[in-house]
Amino acid sequence: EDVKKDVGPKPVFSGYSEFYADIDKGQKILCFFVPGCEHCRDAARDLNALQKKYKDFPQVQIVFMDEESEKIPDFFKYAGKQFPYKVIDVIPFWTKLGSGKDTPGVVYLHNGNLIKFYDGIAEKAFNSKALEKVIYK
C-alpha cells in the first residue's frame, strides 16, 4: 500500500456492491459491456493499456449483458487481458446502467463515490485520455 496516496472522499455506498463486494473500497472502474459490442471492446483494450502504463491504476471489473455471451473469450482476446466479470440478464443490465444511458458504460468510483460516468458513443463516450486526467490530475 502506498501511504502517501490520497485516501480519497468519504466512503459511500455506490449501489454496485451486488456485483462486486469490494466495489466501494478505494478506486475502482466498473464497466457495463455487451460481449459483441465493438466500442465496448475498444474501451476494454484502452483500459488494459492504462493498467499497463500505471502500476496503481484502479481495478477494472466488468458487468456483461447476457447477450452473445459466447463472444466473451474473443472480447478478452481483443482487449488483451481478461478482467473479472459477471454476466447479468438484459433487463437488470439496462436498469443498473441507468435510464437514458447506453453502452459502453465506464464508471469510475472512489470509495463508492461516483467520480465519472462515461456512456454511449456520443459526447459522454469513454475516453481513456480524459479518464487518465481525472485519475492522475
Where are these regions (language model features)?
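N-terminal "domain-start" segment that seeds a small globular fold
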Residues: 1-21
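Short active-site neighborhood of thiol/selenol oxidoreductases, capturing the structured segment around
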Residues: 19-41, 59
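Structural motif
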Residues: 32-36, 64-67, 119-120
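C-terminal luminal/periplasmic domains and tails of membrane-associated envelope-modifying transferases
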Residues: 38-42, 53, 136
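Structural microenvironment flanking redox-active thiols in thiol-disulfide oxidoreductases
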Residues: 43-77
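Short, internal strand/loop/helix patches
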Residues: 78-105
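Non-catalytic, surface beta->alpha helical segment in thiol-disulfide oxidoreductase systems
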Residues: 97-137
